[in-house]
């Protein structure tokens, strides 16, 4: 079976170059070196004041008809900043997260892998599990808080319509509750430590 055409992405906001180097660039360097299947890598940005000038990253403010060959990653920057309001009001995150579906459909990707910019895949076992995931909407369990962790998700093409239905609810509706309790996951993988901060190993 041929691998699914895969989009790997994180969401982003960085105030300056130091923040970019410490977080998003570090995320890129780590995940680009893994045997994680991907056909394109995007950093989807909530109108940061800083825009990277790294030679292997192409900055986009609109989706072109076809992705140019050459860049190792694309930095898609929205023109306006949504940000965050209180605990659940992650407007910027929701917009960036859901825009991954627009990218996938625009370029024929069949699987979306979301690894948040402060999350890192640390074992070959979880990389192999993600590579082998070809259906459903998968999240990984966070035992520290007893919820699925939305910082690590795999959305296969059979769930793209479900993701579109989430997007149709709009940012105002989506930001009244935690993403952990809102996203309609079809599979929650409990055999892994799905934590960003290392509270549970």
State the predicted function of each range.
Residues 44-107:
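Active-site-proximal specificity loops/subdomain of glycosyltransferases
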């Amino acid at each position: 079976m041929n691998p699914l055409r895969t989009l790997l992405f994180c969401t982003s906001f960085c105030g300056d170059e130091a923040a970019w180097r410490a977080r998003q660039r570090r995320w890129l360097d780590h995940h680009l070196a893994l045997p994680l299947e991907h056909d394109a890598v995007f950093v989807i940005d909530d109108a940061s004041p800083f825009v990277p000038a790294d030679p292997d990253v192409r900055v986009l403010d609109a989706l072109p008809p076809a992705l140019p060959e050459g860049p190792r990653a694309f930095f898609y920057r929205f023109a306006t900043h949504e940000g965050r309001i209180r605990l659940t009001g992650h407007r910027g995150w929701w917009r960036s997260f859901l825009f991954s579906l627009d990218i996938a459909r625009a370029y024929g990707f069949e699987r979306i892998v979301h690894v948040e910019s402060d999350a890192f895949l640390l074992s070959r076992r979880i990389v192999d599990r993600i590579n082998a995931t070809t259906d459903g909407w998968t999240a990984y369990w966070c035992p520290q808080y007893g919820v699925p962790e939305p910082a690590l998700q795999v959305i296969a093409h059979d769930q793209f319509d479900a993701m579109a239905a989430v997007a149709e609810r709009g940012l105002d509706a989506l930001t009244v509750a935690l993403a952990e309790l809102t996203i309609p996951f079809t599979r929650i993988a409990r055999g892994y430590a799905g934590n960003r901060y290392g509270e549970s190993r």
